[in-house]
Swiss-Prot record:
Active site residues per record: H138, K159, D177 (proton acceptor), R243
CDD domains (UniProt xref): HprK_C
Name of the protein in its database record: HPr kinase/phosphorylase
GO molecular function annotation: ATP binding; magnesium ion binding; phosphorelay sensor kinase activity; protein serine/threonine kinase activity; protein serine/threonine/tyrosine kinase activity
UniProt source species: Streptococcus pneumoniae serotype 19F (strain G54)
Domain notes: The Walker A ATP-binding motif also binds Pi and PPi.
Length: 311
């Protein structure tokens, strides 16, 4: 995957100091950013020209302190064909030598009024999410009470119908049928729809529904963190399902594990309400309120009292 320079400009609201249209179509293939330091002294061993070059106050001050001809020579060595763009932070004035080198080497020069550290963080986060490797899973991703819940199950079990019912109950659809999931960092999963399926949901017997057109912009979301997985399966009298919520199960995607619960589907059960309760219960556990632990404590206390009375 790659990101175009013009997409970064639009996302971070950067100003274009120099950049022909074809330069804004350059591809960025790495989320790493370089803040050139030793390179300005002429040391180019281990230089990474394929990264976006970000100049803050320190780099700019050192550059300005150099004689004009030395400044131009250093910048010409820094600006290579594979360099996607150069960004100058804090709204600092771009030296004429930089513009001259950029024109000769065909490198876009961009500026931002944001502080260097803040700009670097936003840029890294954006590139990380855009360039992360995607894993496609079958299911429905919903935003329920601000939590990303991935609904999975066998084909025909009613995942999309459950998603539609949740939309009617005020929750938001992120993706139906195919969910593209990526690891935003070592502990966080993020999910989004395939572009062709965005805001659409397929219901057997009805066809494809445009959720945004029918229910409005508040019924959809472009992406969401994936925090909980729910697996729907047919009710089986010969199978034992978790009744206390103490059998921990996990779903692992891209090396990141999230909790997963299994919900048996049976005629008469309102699955959307059950999933709502599961989402709220998970949030309560994250806040330190565990109903299973509370029940266990009460049961232990009751047994202890009975033993004392019967002694």
């Amino acid at each position: 995957m790659s990101v175009l320079v013009k997409e970064v400009i639009e996302k971070l609201r950067l100003d274009i100091v120099y950049g022909e249209p074809e330069l804004l179509e350059k591809e960025i293939n790495t989320a790493d950013i370089t803040r050139p330091g030793l390179e300005m002294t002429g040391y180019f061993d281990y230089y990474t020209p394929e990264r976006i070059q970000l100049l803050g106050m320190k780099e700019w001050s050192y550059l300005i302190s150099m004689p004009s001809n030395s400044r131009y020579e250093v910048l010409k060595k820094m600006f290579l064909p594979e360099t996607p763009a150069v960004i100058v932070a804090r709204g600092l004035v771009v030296p004429e030598e930089m513009l001259k080198a950029a024109r000769e080497c065909k490198i876009a020069i961009l500026t931002s009024r944001a502080a260097t550290s803040r700009l670097s963080g936003k840029l890294s986060s954006y590139l990380d999410s855009r360039l992360a490797e995607r894993t496609s899973v079958h299911g429905v991703l919903m935003d329920i009470y601000g939590m990303g819940v991935l609904i999975q199950g066998d084909s025909g079990i009613g995942k999309s119908e459950t998603g539609l019912e949740l939309v009617k109950r005020g929750h938001r659809l992120v993706a139906d049928d195919r969910v593209d999931i990526f690891a935003k960092d070592e502990i966080t999963l993020w999910g989004e729809p395939a572009e062709i399926l965005k805001h659409l949901i397929e219901i057997r017997g009805v066809g494809i529904i445009d959720v945004m057109s029918l229910y409005g912009a508040s019924a959809v979301k472009d992406s969401s963190q994936v925090q909980l997985a729910v697996y729907l399966e047919n009710y089986d009298t010969h199978k034992t399902f978790d009744r206390l919520g103490n059998n921990a199960e996990e779903l692992e995607v891209s090396g990141v594990a999230i909790p997963r619960i299994r919900i048996p589907v049976k005629t008469g059960r309102n699955i959307s309400v059950v999933i709502e309760a599961a989402a709220m219960n998970y949030r309560a556990k994250e806040m330190g309120f565990d109903a299973t632990r509370l029940f266990d404590e009460r049961l232990t206390s009751l047994i202890a009292r009975n033993e004392v009375q019967n002694a």
